[in-house]
Amino acid sequence: MRFPTPLIEGRLVRRYKRFLADVRLPDGTMVTAHCANPGAMLGLNTDGFRVLLSPSTNPLRKLGYSWELVEAELPGGPQWVGINTARPNALVAEAFRENKLAPLIGYETLRPEVAYGKASRVDFLASGGGRPPCHVEVKNCHLMRHAGLAEFPDCKAARSARHMEELAGVVTAGGRAMLIVVIQMRAGAFDVARDIDPVFDRALRMALEVGVEAYAYTCAVGPEGVAIDTPVPILTPGATVQPARTSG
């Protein structure tokens, strides 16, 4: 996914009220950008980090910029990280169209925001191609506390735990369901940050035990755009989840 307009570079001054970030542009101008990320952003919101903003062309929008990327000092070295949690669903849809998601190859359509469970909407419902419908839940990942290991979540994620329970319900009822973790950076493996949220850890493991599938993909991230790139293994006790090779 290429950014439609060139991103604007700046230096992070502070992130506050979760969804706001003050950024100093190269000419010294201070702007406030929308931070589309409700998480803790551990290791990513350090003052002085280089950031990239996408400008808005909507004259009615209150904030003229959205924070897209940060060049973070992570274990193993600096790298660009995507922090916009609105991007992963679009990245999955793009990868589906390009036949890059091996577990979903053969399906004809990927319909977004379909009602299911008690009171939820699944991110996607894959259907067609003579295959059983598949409920797909997408999670964004940008936490790295150990070199090469991406983790989720970076804060308590009660809603995500509920999603795992509802995916498990789909499989228990005879359907197919999967979790796709979109890692907006380079990594060699994925694991649950169980010390941060043991409830989500238990919910995911229980879902895997009943047959919910789980896949994790890193992304190629840079000033020009973000794209799903490489499958990586998931290190989850009680389940063996192999990386799903991309195709095409």
UniProtKB/Swiss-Prot annotation:
Source taxon at top rank: Bacteria
GO MF annotations in UniProt: DNA binding
Gene3D superfamilies: 2.40.50.580, 3.40.1350.60
Pfam families to which the protein is assigned, alphabetical: SfsA, SfsA_N
HAMAP family membership: SfsA
Family, as annotated: Belongs to the SfsA family.
Protein name (Swiss-Prot/TrEMBL): Sugar fermentation stimulation protein homolog
Organism: Methylorubrum extorquens (strain CM4 / NCIMB 13688) (Methylobacterium extorquens)
